[in-house]
Amino acid sequence: MSKRRIAPLTFLRRLLLRILAALAVFWGGGIALFSVVPVPFSAVMAERQISAWLGGEFGYVAHSDWVSMADISPWMGLAVIAAEDQKFPEHWGFDVPAIEKALAHNERNESRIRGASTLSQQTAKNLFLWDGRSWVRKGLEAGLTLGIETVWSKKRILTVYLNIAEFGDGIFGVEAAAQRYFHKPASRLSLSEAALLAAVLPNPIRYKANAPSGYVRSRQAWIMRQMRQLGGESFMTRNQLN
């Protein structure tokens, strides 16, 4: 009787291990491949596209145009660093002090959860994982972040991030965003335009770059101040990010 009970458990355990091994190979291969090859689509793009189709929105297209860092205004890279992760050149994927502050804040304010994800973590999540706040996803995100930080340069992480970040409904990547909102290539974005795009990143579906709210304008101004305090374009050159 005991053997019959153990057999299904053994089967499930082996199945789970095989699934995890397959995912590890898949994600490891993706990290290696995308260290040199442009990313054609991300997990978030696929999720949005499938959700739209299932909801009957057959006209929805998750649009993205890959561009190299040489074809992106240095203001854009600086803007997302100023807005999302000012210690990006220094850390190995995780900003521990920011995580500790976020945890302390969330304990006091359960209704207003604050995140502390770095650009590296956001890149790992957007590229390979699904939306959500489960501990399983967070654990996978941590492992993928370590893999990306080990294999990719900081410049590569920033390049991929800027090409797969969501800037609006169906708008992925800075080139698509620049063309949609400013009718120009990403290489010609000004400081203020880059800051405006970075200002909607916390929630690009709720916040609109083409119809900015008072909050978005306030955040844009704050990002511009932070960009100047970081040292402007020299920050990107100094940290070999452009």
Curated annotation (Swiss-Prot):
**An example Gene Ontology cellular component term from the record?**
peptidoglycan-based cell wall
Which InterPro entries does the record associate with it? Glyco_trans_51 (IPR001264), Lysozyme-like_dom_sf (IPR023346), PBP_transglycosylase (IPR036950), Pep_trsgly (IPR011812)
Which principal EC class is assigned to this enzyme? transferase
Any single GO molecular-function term of the entry would be:
peptidoglycan glycosyltransferase activity
Q: Which GO terms describe its biological process?
A: cell wall organization; peptidoglycan biosynthetic process; regulation of cell shape
Q: Does the keyword Transferase apply?
A: yes
List membrane-spanning regions.
Answer: 19-39
Where located?
Answer: Cell inner membrane
One Pfam family per UniProt: Transgly
Reactions that this protein is recorded to catalyse: [GlcNAc-(1->4)-Mur2Ac(oyl-L-Ala-gamma-D-Glu-L-Lys-D-Ala-D-Ala)](n)-di-trans,octa-cis-undecaprenyl diphosphate + beta-D-GlcNAc-(1->4)-Mur2Ac(oyl-L-Ala-gamma-D-Glu-L-Lys-D-Ala-D-Ala)-di-trans,octa-cis-undecaprenyl diphosphate = [GlcNAc-(1->4)-Mur2Ac(oyl-L-Ala-gamma-D-Glu-L-Lys-D-Ala-D-Ala)](n+1)-di-trans,octa-cis-undecaprenyl diphosphate + di-trans,octa-cis-undecaprenyl diphosphate + H(+)
Record keywords, A-Z: Cell inner membrane, Cell membrane, Cell shape, Cell wall biogenesis/degradation, Glycosyltransferase, Membrane, Peptidoglycan synthesis, Transferase, Transmembrane, Transmembrane helix
**What's the domain of life for this entry?**
Bacteria
Enzyme Commission no: 2.4.99.28
Q: In which pathway does it act?
A: Cell wall biogenesis; peptidoglycan biosynthesis
Q: How does it sit in the membrane?
A: Single-pass membrane protein
State what this protein does. Peptidoglycan polymerase that catalyzes glycan chain elongation from lipid-linked precursors.
Family under the similarity heading: Belongs to the glycosyltransferase 51 family.
Name this protein carries in UniProt: Biosynthetic peptidoglycan transglycosylase
User: What species is given as this protein's source?
Assistant: Salmonella typhimurium (strain LT2 / SGSC1412 / ATCC 700720)
